Amino acid sequence: MIAVIFEAWPAPGKGEDYMEMAAQLRPHLEKMDGFISVERFRSLIDSDKLLSLSFWRDEAALEAWRNVEMHRSVQAQGRRGVFRDYRLRVAAVLRDYGMFNRDEAPSDSRAAHPVGSDDLLGARL
């Protein structure tokens, strides 16, 4: 699984433009083979900073998205004035687990917090 972390600082008065561009891309994104999910957030520390976090099955799926013409067009719009700055990080997900699905948790973590332990039962109530 691949994670894409896109931090963006819209130019003054351009925050809504970014959100509109993201909304235009969403239907195309959801049709992409290998797309898993995307969410957007605003920083609590820097109110000008937005973050888009997306997950992809593999690098090939991400490469296909990167080369969709509409996506390239929106990227160019962003670079021409919607963004004051941005930073993109692409990372391989090493493990993917949660409170109840512990299959990929490290063995020491599974031993310390087994599914069905008293602390988890209380949390579910």
What residue spans do the PLM features occupy?
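Short arginine-rich
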Residues: A76-G78, R84
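Short S/T/G/P-rich N-terminal loop/turn motif that feeds into the first structured element of a domain
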Residues: M1-L50, E59-N67, F83-L125
